[in-house]
Every structure is written in C-alpha cells, then in structure tokens.
C-alpha cells in the first residue's frame, strides 16, 4: 500500500458486513448500515505535544478497531475503499 498518514492519523479498511441472514435471506445494500469496525492498515508517526516531542499512537498496523459510524474520510487507494481518520475517532481496539 502506497500511503502514509501524517501525524496522529490512521488508515482503516472496513470489515465486510454479512450480506445474508442466518436463514439465508439476502440483505440489500440499501438496508444495511456501514460497519463501524475495521482493520488498521497504516499509521502516522504520532502527535506532537507542546514541547515538540512526538507521542506515539496506541494503535498499530493489524489492530482490529471500532470507530464512530461517521468517523473519517473515505478515500480510494489502489482501487480499495479505505477510511482515513484521527486516532481519537477510534473508540476501542478489539483483542
């Protein structure tokens, strides 16, 4: 992937939602919400504090994360839809 976010920004790939129910019914795209779960694919160097020191991010590449439903900006890199957001928009890391 040819993208490196700046400062405290993170690039996330959304996980795919299931398109069928447990009984086999197909759910149309218009009836589903965008998932608020994803995998971190790139991270910035960190945020600078008042002294100019860089504070490292808590998330790393490969972390599975939860984020606010409308967080981030959707971008397209190498034909893939990704989200770029600030680390503060991530609400949890899934272990």
UniProtKB/Swiss-Prot annotation:
Function: Together with the chaperonin GroEL, plays an essential role in assisting protein folding. The GroEL-GroES system forms a nano-cage that allows encapsulation of the non-native substrate proteins and provides a physical environment optimized to promote and accelerate protein folding. GroES binds to the apical surface of the GroEL ring, thereby capping the opening of the GroEL channel.
NCBIfam families registered for this protein in UniProt: PRK00364.1-2, PRK00364.2-2, PRK00364.2-4
Assembly: Heptamer of 7 subunits arranged in a ring. Interacts with the chaperonin GroEL.
Family: Belongs to the GroES chaperonin family.
UniProt cross-references to InterPro entries, sorted A to Z: Chaperonin_GroES, Chaperonin_GroES_sf, Chaprnonin_Cpn10_CS, GroES-like_sf
Keyword Chaperone: yes
Keyword Chaperone in annotation: yes
HAMAP family per UniProt: CH10
Gene name for this UniProt entry: groES
Name listed for the protein in its UniProt record: Co-chaperonin GroES
One example GO MF annotation: metal ion binding
GO cellular component, one term: cytoplasm
Domain of life: Bacteria
């Amino acid at each position: 992937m040819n993208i490196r976010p700046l400062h405290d920004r993170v690039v996330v790939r959304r996980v795919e939602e299931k398109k069928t129910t447990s009984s086999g019914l197909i759910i149309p795209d218009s009836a589903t919400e965008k998932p608020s779960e994803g995998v971190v694919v790139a991270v910035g160097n960190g945020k600078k504090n008042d002294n100019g020191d860089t504070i490292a991010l808590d998330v790393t590449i490969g972390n599975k994360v939860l984020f606010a439903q409308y967080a981030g900006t959707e971008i397209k890199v190498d034909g893939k839809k990704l989200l770029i957001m600030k680390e503060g928009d991530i609400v949890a890391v899934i272990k």
